[in-house]
């Protein structure tokens, strides 16, 4: 069964998280679909602009286009008045959209979402979601890790792939990626 994953803005704001979710989606199309809203995209781009005030306009256009190429659905409408018990009232629109698109998973780095028996989706951090994906299809995650390694190795004066994942809040997944890269290089896994 293909999982419907609603992606929150904070995932798109992080280049590392954005790249991984989009690359995993492209590598494993039968496993999950990505859904979001214009509101979430606007929030992500607003935050990106706030964080990088000197970025060229084309940079945000490129980021938006790259996101849209990976998204299966940009939800056009949703009922904003659905019941919501989360800690941040400004996140109501995320919950409402996740409900409207019948998401199985809400992918967010926000700790303010509460799961209950009434919530029709499960809340996952990227670290947890990426690790679950690795549990299901480790060979496909390894393929994405190899693509990512090629990109990161071509970037001068940048931190490594593992450190980027740790800095993005994915320490467990970073360890798994390091294991995939060791395996792909022929180095025996650490015990």
Each predicted region: which residue ranges?
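A secondary-structure boundary/capping signal
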Residues: 8, 37, 109-110, 125
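Short, flexible loop segments at the rims of nucleotide/cofactor-binding pockets, characterized by
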Residues: 12, 81-87
